[in-house]
C-alpha cells in the first residue's frame, strides 16, 4: 500500500494513477487532499469511481482529525463528521487518530479523558465498520507505543488499535525495539514502513517530514519489525511512507516504483 506522503507533490488523482501504475493495490488518503479535489470539482462518488477503475482500495484515511474535545478544526484539521463522511464515501478500511499539538497524555491531558474520547471516536466509526488506529510519534502528546496502547486498550473497542510507523518507533522512546511489538501485534491495525538515517537530526520534526530513508536503507530494523508484527499476529496491511526531499525530486513514477521495491525487499527478508 502506498502512503500518500511518499508522493506528496502530486494531487490525489495524479497520485492514484502513479500508484496504480507502479503496482500498488491500495493507498492512504489525506483529508486535506480530498478537500482540494472537491474544490477542483471532484465528488466523493467520482473519486471512488476513479479509484475503483485504477484497482485501488483506500487502506487509510490519514491526517489531522479533531477527535479530542476542544480541538478546533482548520484547513488541515478536519472534524470527525468530515472524516467519517470521507471514509464512508471512499470505502476506506481505517482512520488515523493523531495528537499533533504536543499536549502530553497524563501530563497536559487527563488520560481518562483521552480514553473516553478515543472510545467515542471508535464507536462512531464502528457504525460504518471503520477501524481506528492511534499513531504515536516522538513530538506528539502520544509519543510512544505504551501510551498509544494504554489508550486503545482502555477504550476497549473492537475496532480500535494503534498504528506503527517505523520511523516514529525508531526515533521515539521505543528506540526501534522490534520485540516490544510482538505482544502488541494484535492491537496493531496499521503499519507504515520507512527507515531512519544513522544519526538523528537535532530537529526531529524536520527530519520526520524531510529526511526519512527508504525501507532497508537506514538503521531501523525494518525486517525484524515486520517479522515481529507478523509473529505476534498482526494482520494489518503494510504501507510505505517515506517523507523525503530526495524522493520528492525524483520522477513520480520512478519514486513510486522505488518505494514499492524497497518495501517488498524488506518484507521478503532480503
Could you say what each language-model-derived stretch is?
Residues 1-92, 157-161, 257-270:
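N-terminal pre-domain/capping segments
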Residues 19, 27, 51, 87, ...:
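Conserved, mostly hydrophobic/aromatic
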Residues 5-12, 30-43, 66-76, 102-108, ...:
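Acidic-and-aromatic substrate-binding clefts and catalytic sites of carbohydrate-active enzymes
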Residues 27, 59-61, 119-219:
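Acidic/histidine-rich catalytic cores of soluble enzymes
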Residues 13-17, 50-54, 69-164, 171:
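Active-site acidic/histidine proton-transfer and metal-coordination neighborhood
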Residues 15-18, 43-50, 79-86, 114-121, ...:
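A general structural detector for well-ordered alpha-helical segments in enzyme core domains, enriched
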Residues 28-29, 59-61, 93-99, 132-135, ...:
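Short beta-strand segments at enzyme active-site cores
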Residues 24, 92, 188, 234-235:
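A structural motif
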